[in-house]
Amino acid sequence: MKKKPQWHKLDNAAKIFPANTDKRDTKVFRFSCELYEQIDPVFLQKALEKTLQKFPYYCSILKRGLFWYYIENTERKPLIHIENRYPCSPLYFPNRKSLLFDVSYYHKRINLEVHHVLSDGSGALLFLRTLVYYYILHKHSEAFLNKEIYLENTTTASEKSTDSFSKYFQKEHTSKQQKIPFAYHIKGEYFEIGQMGVIEGCISVKMLLQLSKQHQATVTEFLVAVWIYSIYEGMSVKEQKKPVVISIPVNLRNYFPSDSTRNFFKVIQIVYRFGEQKEDLETVLCSVKKQFQQKLTKEQLRKGMNALSALEHNITMKLVPLATKDYILRFANWISYQKATSCLSNVGKVKMPQEMIPYIRLFDLFVSTKTTQIATCSFEDNFVISIATALKGDLPKRFFCHLSDMGLEIEITTNIEQEC
């Protein structure tokens, strides 16, 4: 008898992604790991097969139900391949049973692309770290002979597929959320649909930390302030009437214990009004730090998480057919888009076993977007800032030039013509 496939409800954060996936914004993000040697595809395929034993949830397809989308396990097995498409190309096709992730390689880089319905950055990063771990372990088996090397990945497959939003949801009276008016939108000519510009800057972690401390700020606070100020420099006086709003995804695992590799994040909004406040970087940074202190607390995040989950648990909403929900979710996404200027995501420090560090140069990530977004991560002393953009313009140049003017040495790589 044919085994009935397992299925999972989408987590709360994932529910908005299927209805809003399109060619311009594929809802795909990419993590990459650059080694000091050329990638061997034979060992990479073996490493992927071993990794999937730890992450069976990844072998899934997205399907439509009567009331909600859902994830269903599949026997389809992924094959690694040389990179042959633009970054963050579509992975989800409504009429096709396609896997929601892809592994490719190019010279010294291993790429993992994931549709956001499957996982968030923290979950996908654990997958890539595991993949790189097995690749190095098998490729250099002689070097690790008689050595016990572990990656802190002891959770079960069941724990990895847990819906942490449902686990922590508490029904409560939700207070009124801060009203944010429509935000300023970055201007520029669009690249062709399916294309995306990527500009990456690699900086010394030590030097960036030192610069942030000089401004009495965390790295994230400092980068958000410089990004806001760089956006301001491209605004007209009339456009300054609208606020600059930066969305910051927050990893809820840092506040609510969870081993899930599915989505478990909450977005906070950092708002600055140049029409009403001073126009210098230090004032912007002061405002950014204050907002982080106010919004980045367990209580505030819990309230926001419950407010989002409440809609999912609403009886009336549950009974609305999926076709109607799609229209509702598209409208909600449009409102969200109107109220944000850009996004900055910092996934933090990437850790690997000490014995494997000599084989790895850096990790990086970037996200599909209809506008311009920043994503950052660090490995050892390499801090990589990746700017993904659907728009032609000099905003990335202004941002990196500000950092360079402050004394940071930056190694720039890009797939578009952009110089600093």
Language model features with spans:
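Alpha-helical scaffolds flanking conserved acidic
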Residues: 110, 219-220, 241-244
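Conserved catalytic core of two-metal-ion nucleotidyltransferases
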Residues: 69-72, 151-152
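Acyl activation and transfer enzymes in specialized metabolism, enriched
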Residues: 36-52, 113-129, 198-236, 385-388, ...
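Tryptophan-centered motif/residue detector
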Residues: 70-71, 101, 135, 165
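Acyl-thioester-dependent acyl-group transfer interface
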Residues: 1-68, 75-102, 233-420
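Short acidic, glycine/Ser/Thr-rich loop/turn "cap" segments at secondary-structure junctions
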Residues: 107-117, 271
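Short, well-ordered alpha-helical segments in soluble proteins
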Residues: 131, 135-139, 231, 292, ...
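Non-catalytic, low-complexity flexible loops and terminal extensions
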Residues: 1-14, 32, 109, 118-126, ...
